[in-house]
Amino acid sequence: MKEYLSNVLEILEEKGVLNESYDLEFKSAKGGLPRSLWESYSAFANSEGGTIILGVSEKDNYCYLDGLGEDVVRKWLDDFWNQINNKEKVSVNLLTAKDVRIEKVKDDINVLIIRVPPASFRYRPVYIGTDMLKGTYRRDHTGDYRCMPEEVKRMLADSLPDKPDSLVLEHSTIEDLDLPTLDQYRNILRSVKPMHPFLTLDNLPFLQRLGAWKVNRATGTYGLTAAGLLMFGKTQSIQEFFPDYHVDYQEISNQGSRWIDRIYPDGTWEANLFQFFHRVWPKLSFSLPKPFLLENGRRRDEGAIHEALREAFANSIIHADYRGQGGIVIKKYPDRFLFVNPGYMLVPLEQYYKGGCSVPRNTTIQTMFSLLGYGEKAGSGSLRIMSAWASAHWRKPFISMTNRPDRVCLDLKMEVLLPKDSLEHLEYIFGKDVRNMYGDALVILSTAEIEGGVSNLRLQGLLNKHSSEISIMLKDLCSQGYLNPENKGRWTSYHLNKGIGLKQGSLFENLDGHLNEKMDTS
């Protein structure tokens, strides 16, 4: 049976099936559970989670319903539970009873809904079959894909109790360290914590207490840890152990132009993490406004924005995967900061925005920074960044991930939610009535104008609203002629409809009424 995809999605959204899903996959189940079901299960679990709908196939914006009766779907449900608990089928069962349900779409046509949560990093990789190197999948904008062995090995390394930066580097020596860097670290520690007991130690025991030098229990030999070399090492030594290591700061005068200032490993300095941080920070923070704050009778030149920016900088170093590709890249624009680091996030995006749960990839490097007062250990770092940007009435920080190679990008825009020039542009396109729209709709249009488009996921991070509420607003903005959708389903993006302008009638009144009607729970 052929149905418009949007119609089926609307039915399922009204039933509350899709409300929390970031991604969606349809599967036909006419002949039983398809093999691709398990590929999607693995892919969702190793990514940001998602929803699988069995009993539907999708093509060219249409859904083709299998027409399965309830008795057939219940049989597939029993088969599903038997298979997911079989270790030879899949490595781990992440689901509970509430994650799997039968839904009637229309008449006697049923589908099986499977909501897959993102797996904790401790359970990754989630793979099908008995060979993780061949049975691990992940998700990107094109769909499910089989991971390369290198991706699988990095997931496995992140799942181990010993963090990658705590491992002893075989054949490393003290000669691999840049001692002037170590002296600088001591001096800063002395300035912030003059009575710290580590300061009385000689270099070797000092490095041991920091976790930079330790014994390999398997061989009985001492050496530098990955953290010790990355933090205090010589550039050549770092690159011998970490061939893809790269750190790069760029200051760019305006969007699209070439950098006007840059710090990168050019051979004139030892490009370890400590030197990179302390060379970049003054340039990164130079243009920030300095508040007048008093602390114990003394003026403080740094406020919440400085602290948040430093937290973001430290986090990009603490959470980076130094075996990954691309290195750490920091870009400063006149109106924004970009922090990009190799690796994938060890907590779901939703958890990052909530705060309160930090899972650093490099705990020893985090300790080294936290001794100097940088890098939160209590999971409040993201909240500090969000709070500071909110206090300045700037657009909410946006974090995104890409893979192949894995990269995490934190975008900190110093723009108000509704810039004057954006409102003027919207007024030029749609007429003066656009200013009378309710706040969230105006934010959606302004974001689409500034960023070239919006998605449900982007707006969830911006508006702090449920995906179902945002879906209603986006649908209404499309129906009234303000937005044009591209693609269909949960991955739809929306762009300003610059071709036809405002229809007759009051959009903001229509939207308010329609939203209130759909949200009425009385």
Write out the residue ranges for each language-model feature.
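Short, cationic-aromatic polyanion-contact patches
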Residues: 438, 488-511
